Amino acid sequence: MHRKEPGARLEATRGAARPHKQGTKPMITRPSVSQLGEGKCPSSQHLQSLRHNKQHALTLTKARCCGECSTCFCTEEKSECQRHEETSPGSCNHQIMSASTISAFCATPRFKQLFKGTVEQMSQM
């Protein structure tokens, strides 16, 4: 697992003007797109189809997250998000959450309920 590398390089290029976002944002109250049901990773095929249907997935869950999660997902979204931030600061309205925040958030019953519904919708596509 190489969790730190892609983010660390990008963080360094942002300079000190923008303090670390990790941990400074409040918990989001919407489900995130990091596909984390019960802490199990979805199959790579599922992730693949999610990338293909990214717009649809975003519409379904009504939230985006580019925090990197220890159990799954999301280096692509995170770096994509940070590239946008570098070219036009303030353009990214994503929540950047640390792995522990995401894990804690995804463990909440409310999220599991919402996530379950999303998975059912996704599987009917």
Curated annotation (Swiss-Prot):
- GO cellular component annotations, sorted alphabetically? cytoplasm; motile cilium; nucleus
> Pfam families this protein is in?
DUF5544 (PF17698)
Q: Which domain of life is it from?
A: Eukaryota
Question: What keyword terms does UniProt attach to this protein?
Answer: Cell projection, Cilium, Cytoplasm, Flagellum, Nucleus
Q: Where in the cell is it found?
A: Cytoplasm; Nucleus; Cell projection, Cilium, Flagellum
Signal peptide boundaries:
none
Q: What tissues is it present in?
A: Expressed in testes and ejaculated spermatozoa (at protein level).
Ranges of biased composition (kind: Basic and acidic residues): 1-12
Q: Note down the stretches annotated as region Disordered.
A: 1-45
The protein's role, per its UniProt record:
May play a role in the flagellum biology.
The protein's name is Testis-specific protein LINC02914
**Source organism:** Homo sapiens
Q: What is the lineage of its organism?
A: Eukaryota, Metazoa, Chordata, Craniata, Vertebrata
